[in-house]
């Protein structure tokens, strides 16, 4: 029985309209040998038999053990999280424009804001952004609006910022008259050389962007850079992995006065890895800048009868109130991801988050230490890291990654495209999901690959 409602004449008309000769041509990017003409299912089998057959076939698929990080991380997601998120009240609900329309949804966002403000040490949080990269771009725009003392629209950025974040930042700000200066990183420790900051002392900056842990996994000298920025009248934008804040000091404690705005990618907290997302960005700030913060903000209030309720607050910033000057941007997808993150943080609690972060660091430390024992392999930088580290290899890193795939391991992120000096370097990441057996298999596979191709 065909479940396609179109007649042959209708299909032909549609194909003629788009200039295709057949339906198969629409799928020509899939190699012919990979296409299945039939599912090869026997006639007359029942649902149980069909399910068992499909399960048996699915079990033939093999998933490599993943040691890639670079901004998106494999963490364990308790089954309860997406079981709750998938409930219709959350899963099919639309982003609330009227506070009274969805008190439960608003409370979830309020709880998210409370937890993110606590995690980052800031006074206020919004309801999320599209992803970490756009959260940074919006943070830069926010800082420029907020810093009335700055005479320019220049922003100083440490070179070890995630390259994708930088590209998104440049794209969003391209026609807004904003200029960027880059501080080169120290090749010995993989982070910004604070002594080089004085080279920029005579330039007026509206903001300084610090990522820690940075793209190369290293912990930046956040105190020195923060104090320098404030001394020269710039606001400090912290870009960070929220999971790291469970064991590292919060951006509110950076330097003498703390960062002014904090942003980053929220994916590590309950959101599964996916090509293209949806993920969500987070943004928190000091109260002095809250009226320039983009995105929705949920507040707690009381109604006429004195009953506690939740509402969208500071709505004059939003698109449905002042479209021409709106700072708001969020969509329903991000609201759903925020729900997952809220449940994730609630289930794990402060102790659970700390345990996840600690085990992730310990596993990465173990992996790096064991790799460095292999002849010709070494840890690239001599400074502290969180859950990913750059490893130098005696062979081309891209070749190494390809060969490790044959051993069932996604070995890490090839850095040659990021920097020409790192053609023989990969960035490896371990989290709480990696077992001692996984790490042992990585080490043995590395020895095998290097022996096979002459490393």
From Swiss-Prot:
Superkingdom classification of source: Bacteria
Instruction: Keyword check for Acetylation, yes or no.
Output: no
Task: Write the signal peptide boundaries.
Answer: none
Q: Which segments of the protein form a coiled coil according to its record?
A: none
Q: What is its EC number?
A: 1.4.4.2
User: What InterPro entries does the entry give?
Assistant: GcvPA, GDC-P_N, GDC_P, PyrdxlP-dep_Trfase, PyrdxlP-dep_Trfase_major, PyrdxlP-dep_Trfase_small
Keywords recorded for this protein, A-Z: Oxidoreductase
Example of a GO biological process term: glycine decarboxylation via glycine cleavage system
One GO molecular-function annotation for this sequence? glycine dehydrogenase (decarboxylating) activity
Q: Which reaction does it catalyse?
A: N(6)-[(R)-lipoyl]-L-lysyl-[glycine-cleavage complex H protein] + glycine + H(+) = N(6)-[(R)-S(8)-aminomethyldihydrolipoyl]-L-lysyl-[glycine-cleavage complex H protein] + CO2
Q: Which PANTHER family match?
A: GLYCINE CLEAVAGE SYSTEM P-PROTEIN, GLYCINE DEHYDROGENASE (DECARBOXYLATING)
Which HAMAP family does the entry mention?
Answer: GcvPA (MF_00712)
Q: What does this protein do?
A: The glycine cleavage system catalyzes the degradation of glycine. The P protein binds the alpha-amino group of glycine through its pyridoxal phosphate cofactor; CO(2) is released and the remaining methylamine moiety is then transferred to the lipoamide cofactor of the H protein.
Q: Which family does it belong to?
A: Belongs to the GcvP family. N-terminal subunit subfamily.
Give the record's subunit note: The glycine cleavage system is composed of four proteins: P, T, L and H. In this organism, the P 'protein' is a heterodimer of two subunits.
- What is the protein name given in its UniProt record? Probable glycine dehydrogenase (decarboxylating) subunit 1
> What is the scientific name of the source organism?
Francisella tularensis subsp. novicida (strain U112)
């Amino acid at each position: 029985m065909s479940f396609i409602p179109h007649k042959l004449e209708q299909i032909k008309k549609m194909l003629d309209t788009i200039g295709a000769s057949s339906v198969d041509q629409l799928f020509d990017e899939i190699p012919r040998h990979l296409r299945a003409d039939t599912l090869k299912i026997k006639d007359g089998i029942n649902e149980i038999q069909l399910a068992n057959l499909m399960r048996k076939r699915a079990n033939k698929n093999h998933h490599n053990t993943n040691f890639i990080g670079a901004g998106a991380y494999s963490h364990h997601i308790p089954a309860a999280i997406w079981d709750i998120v998938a409930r219709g009240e959350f899963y099919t609900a639309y982003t609330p424009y009227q506070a009274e329309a969805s008190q439960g949804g608003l409370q979830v966002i309020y709880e998210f804001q409370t937890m993110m403000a606590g995690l980052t040490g800031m006074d206020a949080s919004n309801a999320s952004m599209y992803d970490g990269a756009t959260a940074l771009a919006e943070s830069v725009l926010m800082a420029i609006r907020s810093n009335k003392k700055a005479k320019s629209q220049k922003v100083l950025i440490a070179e070890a910022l995630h390259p994708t974040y930088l590209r998104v930042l440049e794209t969003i700000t391209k026609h807004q008259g904003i200029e960027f200066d880059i501080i080169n990183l120290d090749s010995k420790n993989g982070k910004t050389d604070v002594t080089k900051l004085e080279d920029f002392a005579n330039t007026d900056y509206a903001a300084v962007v610090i990522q820690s842990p940075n793209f190369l996994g290293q912990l930046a000298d956040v105190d020195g850079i923060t104090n320098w920025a404030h001394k020269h009248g710039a606001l400090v934008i912290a870009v960070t992995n929220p999971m790291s804040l469970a064991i590292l000091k919060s951006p509110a404690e950076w330097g003498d006065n703390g960062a002014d705005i904090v942003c980053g990618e929220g994916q590590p907290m309950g959101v599964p890895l996916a090509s293209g997302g949806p993920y969500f960005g987070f943004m928190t700030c000091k109260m002095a800048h809250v009226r320039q913060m983009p995105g929705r903000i949920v507040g707690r209030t009381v109604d006429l009868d004195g009953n506690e309720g939740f509402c969208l607050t500071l709505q004059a910033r939003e698109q449905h109130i002042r479209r021409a000057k709106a700072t708001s941007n969020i969509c329903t997808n991000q609201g759903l991801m925020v729900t997952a993150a809220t449940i994730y943080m609630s289930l794990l609690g402060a102790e659970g988050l700390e345990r996840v972060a600690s085990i992730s660091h310990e596993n990465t430390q173990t992996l790096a230490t064991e790799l460095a024992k292999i002849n010709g392999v070494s840890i690239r930088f001599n400074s502290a890291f969180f859950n990913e580290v750059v490893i130098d290899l005696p062979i081309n890193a891209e070749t190494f990654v390809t060969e490790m795939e044959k051993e069932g391991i996604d070995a890490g992120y090839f850095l040659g495209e990021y920097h020409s000096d790192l053609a023989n370097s990969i960035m490896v990441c371990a989290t709480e999901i990696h077992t001692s057996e996984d790490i042992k298999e990585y080490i043995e596979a590395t020895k095998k690959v290097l022996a096979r191709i002459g490393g």
